[in-house]
Amino acid sequence: MATPYNHKAIEQKWRKHWQEHPVNVNDGKKPKYYCLDMFPYPSGSGLHVGHWRGYVISDVWSRYKLLNGYYVIHPMGWDAFGLPAENYAIKMGTHPRISTEANIKNIKRQINEISAIYDWDMEVNTTDPEFYKWTQWISVKMFKKGLAYEKQMPINWCPSCKTGLANEEVVNGKCERCGADVTKKNLRQWMLKITAYADRLLADLDKLDWPEKVKKMQAEWIGKSHGAEVNFKVDGRDDEITVYTTRPDTLHGATFMVLAPEHELAKDLATDETREAVEEYIYQASLKSSVDRMQDKEKTGVFTGSYAINPINGAKVPIWLSDYVLADYGTGAIMCVPAHDDRDFEFAKKFDIPIIQVIAKDGKEIENMEEAYTEASGIMINSGDWNGKESSELKEEAPKIIEEMGIGKKTTNYKLRDWVFSRQRYWGEPIPIVHCPDCGAVPVPEEELPLTLPEVEKYEPTGTGESPLADIEDWVNCKCPVCGKDAKRETNTMPQWAGSSWYFLRYIDNKNNEELVSREKADKYLPVDMYIGGVEHAVLHLLYSRFYTKFLCDIGVIDFDEPFHKLFNQGMITGKNGIKMSKSKGNVVSPDDLVRDYGCDSLRMYELFVGPPELDAEWDESGIDGVHRFLTRFYKLIMDQKDKGVEADKELLKVRHKLIYDITTRLNNFSLNTVVSGFMEYTNTLTAMAKKSGVDKETLETAIVLLAPFAPHIAEELWEAMGHEDSVFAQTWPTYDEEAMKEDEVEIVVQINGKVKGKLVIGAEEDKDSVLAKAKEVLGDKLNGNIVKEIYVPGRIVNIVQK
């Protein structure tokens, strides 16, 4: 009798073997396939079963490609700078460097439990000076190309993390990292001009084999729109206010203007009578987040006391401030057409501002408007020379007319804002800029990089708008690289996204001290073929990575401008009732105990079995027991049958090729949960066949190779048991023969007038006349009327219509 399945002994044996004899070796002859995980930030809580899901999916795909003859680039590293690592260190009362090193050690141990074919020789760590030397090098190159610049501006401010945040880091008005309500703070910031790439970032989405959902999210974030900028003169002053509108055809209906409270003219426009109210309103608005301001709450506002002149008709329009207008979108000022915009209508009604309808269905004005008329088209009314025109046509013509009149210009606008790139924290890459009183902002010479992060005693955020680095005088004070005079270093640090925007390029040449990546290796191994990670990074990391890749392509470092050919977003594994796993909620399931009790192979397969991989799934620990029982049955089947010497008959061949077809098709479609259920079904089928007449060696070996990417340890053990000395991963993925899969006989349904009256077994290739004759025999005396029609759907149904 065969030895029972002992997962502990088998997994220990093969892990040791793989360390000594790696299965994924670059022999220089195979084509490359680059399969990449989104690298983790080393949190203190370690990995839970949700993290495992993505890593298992990527390893299954990598091993599948290995069996298809590729050299697989499958690296791993650490996204270790930034707020998560620093906040954890502060909470634990340790230096972030020390806590980060300890966390990496623990998570690396946990990742190795997965038995993924990671190439640890390629490992990168964003906090390693030899890595962030190149993060700084990229920022210097961007500065020299005019893509990095300083600006005093109101930014998103997290009062808990005590740092500025990019728009992309604010979710529903809260800090993406700590959940605190985000406010606004006016600070000097470093910005990256991602807007210079807006058109390319949008257009090139069409090139990507990515989920449509992600491409749509990026397209909406970039938010391209066409319209016009229109200049309104301020009555009695030399100032002009420019607004951006996508509906220049409604200009005659603009009865007031609204400025963002942060607009540069906001305070200046206040009169003596309104100044106190205006300044109080500006202050209150500064305490709100952008999301709070944009929500559908009752609109607030304050009249400045000043008026602008509508350039199309000379009408005086009052200038208001309201926090529903944001300084960083468009021009920070809008013209308001209350008759045709719900928000403007609500505002006008509240503050008793005139409402002039300029678009009407059939050209008829609505008496006593109760709501805005927001239909996309209609006939122009109350619009001077534009009366009688079709509004949708005028919308296209108006920008040109406005340009010819000299009151504005045709414009394309984007929701995308330049990237706030500085953080007022310690744990990040120092920004390699020196501030000189004479020369201004000057980059640190490239040959002096990396500019290393100094050791500090006190690294907690200050909350003053200055980073803790500002207190280290012997580090801050330096000489200007251009003129040699006394100067000061930039004390803000880069955001966490700086290193993660390009790390995938470094893996393949991580020990190169002369270049970010050699062009030879870049041409040979890049870009990434498959990127696997959570959809929560759709806008942040994925957009930033595309921006960095395009920039590095433009300066000749690489010759491709999109980083990731294919993207797969796995769903989240949640606790009970769909609640996200977190230490604070006490619902984290650690993989460590499950690996001990059931084995790595069982956990790998259960991670795939819980549901479609692209959807969220609720963790139910009882399910892993069923997967473990399946592996036990599979092991027993192989061990019992391996020496029987059975010859393959037609039925065994059919099952073998159907097995190959189903597993391969489901795997290629990323229907990984049905791959596991398929293995279970076919194991039951083969077990039943084994009891009758046995299973041949080739079918057993085929099943082992197919299982290998999913459960590598048991596959290696069984491959060896079949008498092989080489690795199961040195084999070639099996191919199916469609002819061998065909059924000899099929069962069909026999109907009279569409109602089932019996069933019939026929030959798969049997002709129509023969099938109809047999069907009539089955029906017998049930055929008691006049036959009107005989219908045969090959291999499925006979339907006889009688009266």
Tell me what each language-model feature is.
Residues 1-21, 25-32, 260-263, 272-275, ...:
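Basic, alpha-helical terminal appendages of large translation-related enzymes
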Residues 1-36, 66-75, 99-106, 281-320, ...:
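Conserved oxyanion/phosphate-binding beta-strand-loop segments in alpha/beta enzyme cores
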Residues 4, 12-13, 17-21, 91-241, ...:
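Residue patterns forming the tRNA-binding/recognition surfaces of aminoacyl-tRNA synthetases
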Residues 27-94, 123-138, 161, 245-246, ...:
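N-terminal catalytic cores of NTP/NDP-binding nucleotidyl/phosphoryl-transfer enzymes
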Residues 58, 71, 263-362, 367-368, ...:
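Catalytic alpha/beta core of large soluble enzyme barrels
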Residues 79, 144-160, 410-441, 496, ...:
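Helix-rich, typically C-terminal accessory recognition domains appended to large enzymatic cores
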Residues 194-224, 260-302, 447-479, 703-732:
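Amphipathic alpha-helical
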Residues 306-312, 316-329, 476-613:
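Alpha-helical recognition segments enriched in aromatics with Gly/Pro capping
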